[in-house]
């Protein structure tokens, strides 16, 4: 149908609407600004703790003892760089949001930015044009609109004059114009985007667990700090500078500062690896989140199926050149729809006939055709329209269609296709059976999730039969339900979701309700989607996964964006998440062992200092300065932890992170702390000690600490592979070199020259290592865990 051209607004009318604020001001999408990203990564609990201690150390003038302050920069930089990179990528992807509509005004027809559209503007449409605001069609020529990003319905919808069009949809055929009736925040797509516009952080057990540990340590630092300050300043004869440095030396190792850094590095490396697979991660912990998911809600269109269809069968009903006819019809269609494009792909050798008349496809008539003179008049379309619905051929087509397939009838007509009463009498020639093009990797992806005990729910706006057919072909078995029959009550909805696998005719609000219902049953839910209709469900799910070709709103709220639109990338994301979770849990034992022995040492030294004040015994200096605890962490924790955090690890993700790591770290830390304190007491010469003797006592304590801590590393590195053994051996060798090189001894304030003291310290350290080994085997037996030394 063709309608008359509508006049556009005058310049005065446009100016008036701008003055009244009736413009298309699109809501800010759900993403943090650069300043918000910087604030979130700089002003953290651990940076605050380290920052205060760093300033205290600098006040003493000892720069070398402030080396731990570099961690403040590293902790912040990794998170900032990654999030800003993700933000920049998303901004570049927002092409749809920058589509330039063509408006018709008194001053002429011109392309403008979406934000420059005003209420009542006449906006022209052509194939592929984005509809940027809600409106009403005022003129059309065979206009068809794809609203799949809004409704999930894959089939294009014919639009006549007076019909509404919604922002977020686009033109697939024909041309026309519409009048803007709702702009800015009143538009449909903008309302969904605004409802989802508040930024929310992804849930992370690792992040939450580490924050709980840091919170506890923060509370612990106050009494421990006061005790250490008092004993070092008021019970010893050391000057304020020496006392302050040893106080900081007691407090710094209590903070598992490297754990936050190592977690960020492990996540960042995972992000880089996934980036090579065209997977954009908006937030670092999203990798962990997907590894913990036990239900994936997958949108059928664009996730399990590709855009387009394929010919799955051709049922010839008469003798003749059916393939030639199909090839010629497809070749002559200048703007083929999905069905004709599939036929063109299947039949690529047209006979070269000349067309004498054509009839384009219209949704209202549901057929198209071409007349070829002596070669006949050929039509193709819906069987129940071209034939009597009660005819055997139409009934056969209906039976095939009930399997979720699309069926077209190819037939010859007794009159030209441009005749007023066309198509006339149609003689059936063939049934063309089409099916949605299934992604070649979708089946393997679903098999992977099944093997990992992850349930997959297929959700779509298409009819339930079609959705169920696609799921069945992919080996996803289970009951199919039409979402129009879903119960409204959350409890009953949750029960239905547990029983059924595929859902058709799902509304956008139902997708969100389905996510909530699954979460109410304790499930960790991932949601995949690409349209505006998926935005709220993506936002409320535990992990939102958007397609790169989808709407800008869906990409903004999702934690993970698949830039190449491949559902098959998700198993790699799960694998990276498992690597991060398993390895961070492993290296957490190293960092928290240090926290435990540091707290124990501070308490024991504090008690010793109070005893000196009460009973008049020799005062007790804290054994270490900040540089000592810094080098102690280099090769017992820092570098080995970094290497271990990047190692392959495909263990299933489990909950209870804090409980498990503390169960391992607490006994090890107590052993290391006790052994170090005993070694220090043996070597300590009391009030009369010379500076050299005090340095030798500190060195002895450090040797004991290193010997026992290195065995903690040896235990954490199990089960051994050749490179893990080499890692532990190199760590041991590094400390041998540090203690052997005179320049290093002077720089790090070490003196191992008293062989008697050094030998005793080493012996105590080896005894601590032996006890740690025994505890590891005992813990395995008590917890019922298999202990393996070698892989």
Swiss-Prot record:
The gene is ctpE. The active site is at 299 (4-aspartylphosphate intermediate). The chain crosses the membrane at residues 53-73, 213-233, 252-272, 596-616, 627-647, 664-684, 697-717, 725-745, 757-777. This is Calcium-transporting ATPase CtpE. It comes from Mycolicibacterium smegmatis (strain ATCC 700084 / mc(2)155). Disruption phenotype: Disruption of the gene leads to impaired growth under Ca(2+)-deficient conditions. Mutant also shows hypersensitivity to polymyxin B, increased biofilm formation and higher cell aggregation, indicating cell envelope defects. It catalyses: Ca(2+)(in) + ATP + H2O = Ca(2+)(out) + ADP + phosphate + H(+). Keywords: ATP-binding, Calcium, Calcium transport, Cell membrane, Ion transport, Magnesium, Membrane, Metal-binding, Nucleotide-binding, Phosphoprotein, Translocase, Transmembrane, Transmembrane helix, Transport. CDD domains: P-type_ATPase (cd02609).
């Amino acid at each position: 149908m063709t309608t008359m051209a509508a006049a556009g607004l005058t310049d005065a009318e446009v100016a008036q609407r701008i003055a009244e604020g009736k413009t298309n001001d699109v809501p800010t999408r759900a993403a943090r600004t650069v300043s918000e990203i910087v604030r979130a990564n700089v002003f953290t609990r651990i940076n605050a703790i380290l920052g205060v201690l760093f300033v205290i150390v600098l006040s003493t003038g000892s720069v070398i003892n402030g080396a731990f302050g570099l961690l403040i920069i590293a902790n912040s930089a990794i998170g900032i760089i990654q999030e800003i990179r993700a933000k920049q990528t998303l901004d570049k992807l927002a092409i749809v949001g920058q589509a330039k509509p063509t408006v018709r005004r008194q001053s002429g027809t011109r392309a403008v930015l979406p934000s420059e559209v005003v209420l009542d503007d006449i906006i022209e449409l052509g194939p592929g044009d984005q509809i940027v605001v809600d409106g009403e069609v005022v003129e059309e020529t065979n206009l068809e609109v794809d609203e799949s990003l809004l409704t999930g319905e894959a089939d294009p919808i014919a639009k006549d004059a007076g019909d509404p069009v919604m922002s977020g949809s686009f033109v697939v055929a024909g041309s026309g114009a519409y009048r803007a009736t709702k702009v800015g925040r009143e538009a449909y797509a903008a309302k969904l985007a605004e409802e989802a516009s508040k930024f929310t952080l992804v849930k992370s057990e690792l992040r939450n667990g580490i924050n709980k540990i840091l919170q506890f340590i923060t509370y612990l630092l106050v009494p421990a700090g006061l005790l250490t300050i008092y004993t070092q300043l008021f019970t010893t004869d050391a000057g304020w500078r020496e006392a302050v440095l040893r106080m900081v030396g007691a407090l710094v190792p209590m903070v598992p500062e490297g754990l936050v850094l190592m977690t960020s590095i492990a996540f960042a490396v995972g992000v880089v690896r996934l980036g090579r697979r065209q997977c954009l991660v908006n937030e670092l912990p999203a990798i962990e989140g997907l590894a913990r998911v036990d239900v994936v809600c997958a949108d059928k269109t664009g996730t399990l199926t590709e855009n387009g269809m394929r010919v799955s069968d051709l049922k010839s009903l008469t003798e003749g050149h059916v393939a030639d006819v199909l090839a010629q019809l497809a070749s002559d269609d200048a703007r083929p729809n999905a069905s004709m494009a599939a036929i063109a792909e299947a039949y690529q050798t047209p006979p070269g006939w000349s067309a004498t008349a054509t009839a384009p496809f219209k949704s209202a008539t549901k057929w198209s055709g071409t007349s070829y003179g002596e070669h006949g008049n050929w039509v193709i379309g819906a069987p129940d329209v071209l034939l009597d619905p009660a005819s055997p051929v139409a009934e056969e087509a209906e039976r095939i269609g009930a399997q979720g397939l699309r069926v077209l009838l190819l037939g010859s007509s007794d009159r030209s296709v441009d005749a007023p009463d066309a198509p006339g009498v149609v003689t059936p020639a063939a049934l063309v059976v089409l099916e949605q093009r299934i992604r070649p990797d979708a089946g393997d992806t679903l098999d992977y999730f099944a093997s990992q005990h992850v349930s997959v729910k297929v959700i779509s706006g298409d009819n339930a039969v079609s959705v169920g057919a696609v799921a069945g072909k992919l080996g996803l078995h289970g009951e199919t339900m039409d979402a129009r029959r879903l119960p409204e009550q959350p409890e009953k909805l949750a029960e239905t979701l547990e029983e059924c696998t595929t859902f058709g005719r799902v509304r956008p609000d139902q997708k969100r309700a389905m996510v909530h219902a699954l979460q109410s049953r304790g499930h960790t839910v991932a949601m995949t989607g690409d349209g505006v209709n998926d935005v709220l469900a993506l936002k409320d799910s535990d992990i939102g996964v958007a397609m790169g070709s989808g709407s800008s709103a869906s990409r903004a709220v999702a934690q993970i964006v698949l830039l190449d639109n491949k559902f098959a990338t998700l198993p790699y994301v799960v694998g990276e998440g498992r690597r991060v979770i398993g390895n961070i849990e492993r290296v957490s034992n190293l960092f928290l062992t240090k926290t435990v022995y540091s707290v124990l040492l501070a308490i024991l030294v504090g008690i010793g200092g109070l005893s000196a004040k009460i009973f008049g015994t020799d005062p007790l200096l804290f054994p270490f300065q900040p540089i000592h605890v810094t080098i102690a962490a280099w090769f017992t924790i820092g570098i080995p932890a970094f290497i271990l955090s990047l190692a392959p690890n495909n263990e299933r993700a489990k909950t209870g992170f804090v409980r498990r790591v503390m169960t391992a770290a607490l006994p090890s830390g107590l052993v290391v702390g006790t052994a170090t304190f005993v070694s220090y007491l043996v070597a300590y010469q009391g009030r009369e000690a010379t500076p050299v003797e005090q340095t030798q006592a500190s060195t002895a304590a450090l040797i004991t600490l290193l010997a026992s801590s290195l065995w903690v590393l040896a235990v954490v590195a199990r089960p051994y592979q050749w490179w893990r053994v080499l890692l532990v051996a190199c760590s041991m060798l590094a400390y041998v070199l540090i203690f052997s090189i005179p320049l290093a001894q002077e720089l790090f304030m070490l003196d191992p020259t008293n062989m008697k003291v050094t030998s005793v310290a080493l012996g105590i350290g080896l005894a601590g290592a032996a006890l740690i080994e025994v505890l590891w085997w005992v813990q395995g037996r008590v917890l019922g865990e298999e202990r393996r030394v070698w892989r």
